Structure formats: structure tokens, C-alpha cells
Amino acid sequence: MANSGLQLLGFSMAMLGWVGLIASTAIPQWQMSSYAGDNIITAQAMYKGLWMECVTQSTGMMSCKMYDSVLALPGALQATRALMVVSLVLGFLAMFVATMGMKCTRCGGDDKAKKARIAMTGGIVFIVAGLAALVACSWIGHQIVTDFYNPLTPMNVKYEFGPAIFIGWAGSALVLLGGALLSCSCPGSESKAAYRAPRSYPKSNSSKEYV
């Protein structure tokens, strides 16, 4: 039987993970490549994100450029963008639904079984959102590894994992765990716990008839 403390813990974890997914989607450090050119002074660090690519000079100045065409992007990057956006939208809906079903709120009425079902629905939506983000981060991570070990890829254009991927993985894990805790609000378990078997009392001897 889920209590309000467990629901609050799950909701907090899921919300924290959702904020991490927002940060991961926004920052451009999904892929990073640091290398020095012929001149040490012109050393550059290149980053690729979901929406833009950036170049950081050795002086610390960063210049970013949005992608010109969506159709020109690799398939893995397009799929990752779509999955991350879907994950963020589902996470927002899950927070709204879970808030109505939590025991510590007055939304959703006073019916405990109904609120438990609402909280469980919010937890399931959180799990779907976490899975979408996990697939997105793992997909582009697999693509980075494949390109890195491809002998046909020049050394100066090979990329490694950026911090955004690790933030995305951590956020996905928190959303999944938080959704799992909220999903423990199963109405069936509460109804069983609330059931009390009627007591049976022995018949009194005074009710016997004597002949």
C-alpha cells in the first residue's frame, strides 16, 4: 500500500529527472571533440547538440550556429530530437496527472481509490517518458561509438560523449524510478487492505431451548 511519503518521494525524483531532461535537451554538448590544429593558439573545441553546433576557441569565446536544414541531419539525431521532445511533453502531463492523484493534495476529490488510480496513471506516464528519453540518449550514444571506431572517419572529426548525454541518462533513471514509486499506488492493494472480515461470535447458551 502506497503512502503519501512514498508518493512524494517518487514525484520529487521524477520532477528532478524531468528538469535534468530539459537541461540535457537544451545544451549543445551532446557530442564533443577537442583537438589542436597546426597552431596551438587556434586550438578549438567543437560541440554538437540537438539544435545547434558550437565552436569554442582557446580564448574562451564560443560561437554557435543553428542547424540550417532538418532534412540534412542524420537519422539518429532526428530521432533523438523527436524522442526527447516527446519525453518532455509526457513528463509535463505526468506531473499534472500525478499531482491530482497524490494523497497530500486536495485535487481529484476525496475518493482514495480514485486518487490512487490517478497517481498510478501519472506514474505510468512518467515511466513512458523516462523510457523515451533513455532510448534517445542510448541511440545517439551508440551512433557516437560507431562513428568513433569507424576507420573511415578522420581523426579530426571524431566525437565523444558530451555531458548532455550523461545528464540525459541520469534524468531518465530518476524519471523511471519516480514513476515506478508512483505506480505503486495500486487501488487494488488499498481496497484489500481496507477490507475487514466480519467477526463471528459464538452463539449464547441462553438461546437454547430446554424441553
Swiss-Prot record:
Name the principal localization, coarsely classed.
Answer: membrane
Give the matching InterPro entries. Claudin, Claudin7, Claudin_CS, PMP22/EMP/MP20/Claudin
Q: Where in the cell is it found?
A: Cell membrane; Basolateral cell membrane; Cell junction, Tight junction
Would you tell me the Gene Ontology cellular component terms?
A: apicolateral plasma membrane; basolateral plasma membrane; bicellular tight junction; lateral plasma membrane; membrane; plasma membrane
Domain of life of the organism in this record?
Answer: Eukaryota
Tissue expression from the record: Expressed predominantly in lung and kidney.
Question: What molecular functions are annotated in GO for this chain?
Answer: identical protein binding; structural molecule activity
Q: Which GO terms describe its biological process?
A: calcium-independent cell-cell adhesion via plasma membrane cell-adhesion molecules
Q: Where is this region: Interactions with TJP1, TJP2 and TJP3?
A: 210-211
PTM comment, free text? Phosphorylated.
Q: Topology check: give the Cytoplasmic ranges.
A: 1-7, 103-119, 182-211
Pfam families membership: PMP22_Claudin
The record lists the membrane-crossing segments as 8-28, 82-102, 120-140, 161-181
Membrane topology value:
Multi-pass membrane protein
Question: What biological function has been recorded for the protein in this entry?
Answer: Plays a major role in tight junction-specific obliteration of the intercellular space, through calcium-independent cell-adhesion activity.
Q: Which family does it belong to?
A: Belongs to the claudin family.
Q: How does it assemble?
A: Directly interacts with TJP1/ZO-1, TJP2/ZO-2 and TJP3/ZO-3. The phosphorylated form interacts with EPCAM.
Its name, as the record gives it, is Claudin-7
The species this protein belongs to is Mus musculus (Mouse)
Instruction: State the encoding gene.
Output: Cldn7
